[in-house]
Amino acid sequence: MSYKLMLVENDIVLSKAIQEYLIDQGFNVYIANNGLEALNLAYQYNFDLIISDIMMPLVNGYELLAKLKKNKALSKIPVIFLTAKGMTKDRIKGYDMGCYGYLSKPFDPNELLSIINNLIARDVLKEASLQNSATSNQQLNHKIRLTPREKSILDLVVDGLTNKEISTILNTSVRNVEKYVSRLLHKTNMKNRTLLVKYSINNNLLNNEINERANDGTRTRE
């Protein structure tokens, strides 16, 4: 089983180095450069583990962990802190908040791998993965219900068409298309068209033909 990890680190060089190391170990690794970006990614993908720095702009690591714990769909994702905040009081705060590991920089990547493998051996990642999948399916079954018209417009949005182009194809007004796009954003809880497209592809909201084209190379126009 290939586990899906998110690395939250605002040091671009360090994040790339860690990503390459973990990919070599067989993991799928996504990168977020701050806590806010991490939250947006967490809502889109079912991560098995999050490795996060603490000192970051917008949303710091402690705040990120607190927000994850408050969300039923994300609360079981284990978090490992990887940070320069190495004081005992900082480590205690992290563990009290529910982190599964705390590594101080500079660190040995083999120690990080050991912590991850320990979580795998204890089935912590498997439990998080199953919980994420169940929650995701439940959300799709009970919350994301699209009308035929919404599905038609969503397919065209994923194809990269503008509202004007969609209105021409469907023989309706631009304002009416805008209304449906706004409704789709609301139903999926996405902030813009790009995130809507990614969410739709990842959660199979499209028909098979559109999904195959999208996976070949998604293009969107804001």
UniProtKB/Swiss-Prot annotation:
<protein>
    <recommendedName>
        <fullName>Probable transcriptional regulator ycf29</fullName>
    </recommendedName>
</protein>
<dbReference type="InterPro" id="IPR011006">
    <property type="entry name" value="CheY-like_superfamily"/>
</dbReference>
<keyword id="KW-0238">DNA-binding</keyword>
<dbReference type="Pfam" id="PF00196">
    <property type="entry name" value="GerE"/>
</dbReference>
<dbReference type="InterPro" id="IPR001789">
    <property type="entry name" value="Sig_transdc_resp-reg_receiver"/>
</dbReference>
<feature type="domain" description="HTH luxR-type">
    <location>
        <begin position="139"/>
        <end position="204"/>
    </location>
</feature>
<feature type="domain" description="Response regulatory">
    <location>
        <begin position="4"/>
        <end position="120"/>
    </location>
</feature>
<keyword id="KW-0805">Transcription regulation</keyword>
<keyword id="KW-0150">Chloroplast</keyword>
<dbReference type="InterPro" id="IPR036388">
    <property type="entry name" value="WH-like_DNA-bd_sf"/>
</dbReference>
<dbReference type="GO" id="GO:0000155">
    <property type="term" value="F:phosphorelay sensor kinase activity"/>
</dbReference>
<keyword id="KW-0804">Transcription</keyword>
<keyword id="KW-0902">Two-component regulatory system</keyword>
<dbReference type="Pfam" id="PF00072">
    <property type="entry name" value="Response_reg"/>
</dbReference>
<dbReference type="InterPro" id="IPR016032">
    <property type="entry name" value="Sig_transdc_resp-reg_C-effctor"/>
</dbReference>
<keyword id="KW-0934">Plastid</keyword>
<dbReference type="InterPro" id="IPR000792">
    <property type="entry name" value="Tscrpt_reg_LuxR_C"/>
</dbReference>
<feature type="DNA-binding region" description="H-T-H motif">
    <location>
        <begin position="163"/>
        <end position="182"/>
    </location>
</feature>
<feature type="modified residue" description="4-aspartylphosphate">
    <location>
        <position position="53"/>
    </location>
</feature>
<dbReference type="GO" id="GO:0003677">
    <property type="term" value="F:DNA binding"/>
</dbReference>
<keyword id="KW-0597">Phosphoprotein</keyword>
<dbReference type="GO" id="GO:0009507">
    <property type="term" value="C:chloroplast"/>
</dbReference>
<dbReference type="GO" id="GO:0006355">
    <property type="term" value="P:regulation of DNA-templated transcription"/>
</dbReference>
